[in-house]
Amino acid sequence: MQTLVFNTTTRTAKLYEGVAEKSEIIVAYTEVPTVKVMDDGFYQVMQLDAMEKQLPVLRVPIANTNMFVKS
């Protein structure tokens, strides 16, 4: 099971292959204001572009993803 870690202080999101901070990072994003929980069963990572507009950059299924929010 993969793990998504969203840090609200540093505004980062990291997706780990397995256990957070003990396994390989699959992908990491900066300038992440929020991670949305979508009605269709996905976590959606939103990132700010140069115009400060939020764009979806990653969708992962809730069914096989643990998510942790750090501050």
Q: What are the residue ranges of the model-derived segments?
A:
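Short intrinsically disordered terminal tails
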Residues: 1-2, 69-71
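Anionic N-terminal interaction surfaces
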Residues: 1-11, 18-19, 24
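Acidic, low-complexity, intrinsically disordered interaction modules
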Residues: 16-65
